[in-house]
A protein has these predicted regions:
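Conserved segment of winged-helix/HTH DNA-binding domains
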Residues: 71-96, 111, 117-121
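Beta-hairpin "wing" of winged helix-turn-helix
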Residues: 52-62, 66-68
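C-terminal regulatory/oligomerization modules of transcriptional regulators
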Residues: 94-166
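A short alpha-helical element within helix-turn-helix/winged-helix DNA-binding domains
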Residues: 26-36
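Short amphipathic alpha-helical interface segments
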Residues: 10-22
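Key DNA-contact positions within bacterial/archaeal DNA-binding proteins
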Residues: 40
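Alpha-helical residues within the helix-turn-helix
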Residues: 33, 50-51
């Protein structure tokens, strides 16, 4: 599993915009310089974030990008799925069946169960992390993760996760 550059840089741009004190927001050149990315790539990422409803743009000489809603309302799981999708897409088995039209393991597939459990746990965590959490302190997501781990020992069951996803 890998985090794509679009997910990483898109999230970094969003954190940078959230931390901007200027009411005009940040322009593409400002974001480009701050993150060390090309203006073209920043524009592409900004378009994806704008289409996802996370940022608004103000055109013109003094224009820029601002958050479309308060940072505490922007859920990181939604941001990452907008930028790149799920780690394990439910259609994965249909598109990665090798030379056959149908995966030979489609009825009994232990690797699919593993990916579904990992996706479930990642979703549970990322659904609790907001842009506000990331733009204020690195400790906040760690605290959320610790709380989730405490809950997981009480409530998560691999049988429930897999059967709910099939």
């Amino acid at each position: 599993m890998k985090i794509t550059s679009q997910e990483e840089y898109g999230l970094r741009l969003l954190i940078r915009i959230a931390g901007c004190k200027d009411k005009q927001g940040m322009s593409i050149p400002q974001l480009s310089e701050a993150e060390g990315l090309s203006s073209h790539y920043v524009a592409k990422l900004a378009r994806v974030l704008r289409m996802g409803g996370f940022i608004n743009s103000t055109p013109g000489y003094k224009g820029g990008y601002v958050l479309a809603m308060p940072a505490d309302k922007i859920v990181i799981n939604k941001v990452l799925k907008t930028l790149g999708g799920s780690l394990f897409d439910k259609d994965f088995c249909e598109t990665h069946s090798g030379k056959l039209n149908l995966c030979t393991n489609s009825v009994e597939c232990s690797s699919r169960s593993l990916w579904q459990m990992i996706q479930f746990i990642v979703d549970q965590f990322l659904d609790q992390v907001t842009l506000h959490d990331l733009s204020n302190s690195e400790k906040k997501p760690v605290n959320i993760f610790d709380e989730l781990l405490d809950q997981s020992t009480k409530t998560f069951s691999a049988k429930n996760i897999v059967s709910d996803r099939l």
